[in-house]
């Protein structure tokens, strides 16, 4: 077993054209001192002046949280642990079901623009879609937001073919399915394991969305136009009796943001990824 662990992280990307975070892991055996310590550096040039003795080790806690919690001081960690047991604070899971967004198996095929929708007469088998983080604006997703996305030529519709015999489909719908098969869209793993590759499973309209990957701050958005989302966002269905507006107001504060930083992970390029 390792007695001491040193982690070195970087503010800037280390490898050109690769937007992934790099962490240097140093493990040491032996000695009486035990714990973990973290050094934050701007870039590789900082190794020239790095002094490992300037930062002491913290006691390693064997808990479920990610190691990013060791970025905070002992006093800050004590405050965070106090908040966890404070009955004035609750978890999202106390108010609703949280699930990943729809896994289409092929977003390019199942998420379409208005132009493609019109070409294959797909309007009656599509749902308003949030396909990317750039589709979300503000704390509500409304019909006006959806209309703007459509006008901008975004893939703002999800194809949701019905679970009825194929012979009952319109000729235009059959044509689009044939187009997918001719171009190999049905060969991907997620599509190939379905009974009918062109029917997307687990489609339901959520009450709210929680953005999976965030740049400025972790977005929580209420659904105001019966939209659905791909797995770029998480979807929330509130329990009966829960007021979504109150949950929305309660979420946007510094404490919530602090917990998303601690529980989430750095995806690279300054992006924070949050998983249910």
Please give the residue ranges for each predicted region:
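Polybasic, glycine- and aromatic-enriched phosphate-binding surface used to engage nucleic acids
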Residues: 76-276
């Amino acid at each position: 077993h390792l007695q001491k662990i040193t982690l070195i992280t970087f503010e800037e990307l280390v490898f050109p054209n690769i937007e992934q975070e790099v962490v240097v892991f140093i493990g040491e055996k032996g000695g009486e001192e035990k714990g973990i310590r973290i050094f934050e550096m701007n870039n590789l040039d900082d190794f020239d002046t790095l002094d490992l003795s300037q930062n002491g080790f913290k006691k390693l806690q064997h808990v479920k949280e990610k190691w990013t919690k060791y970025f905070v001081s002992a006093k800050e960690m004590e405050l965070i642990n106090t908040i966890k047991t404070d009955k004035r604070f609750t978890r999202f899971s106390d108010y609703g079901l949280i699930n990943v967004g729809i896994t289409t198996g092929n977003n390019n095929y199942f998420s379409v623009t208005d132009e493609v929708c019109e070409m294959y007469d797909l309007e009656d088998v599509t749902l308003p879609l949030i396909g990317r983080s750039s589709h979300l604006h503000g704390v509500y997703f409304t019909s006006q937001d959806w209309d703007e996305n459509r006008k901008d030529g975004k893939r703002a519709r999800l194809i949701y073919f019905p679970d009825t015999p194929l012979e009952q489909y319109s000729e235009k719908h059959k044509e689009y399915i044939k187009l997918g098969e001719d171009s190999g869209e049905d060969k991907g793993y997620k599509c190939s394991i379905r009974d009918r590759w062109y029917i997307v499973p687990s489609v339901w309209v959520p009450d709210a969305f929680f953005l999976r990957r965030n740049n400025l701050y972790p977005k929580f958005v209420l659904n105001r136009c019966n939209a659905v989302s791909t797995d770029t966002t998480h979807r929330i269905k509130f329990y009966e009796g829960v007021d979504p507006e109150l949950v929305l107001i309660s979420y946007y504060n510094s404490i919530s943001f602090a917990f998303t930083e601690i529980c989430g992970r750095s995806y690279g390029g300054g992006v924070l990824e949050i998983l249910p």
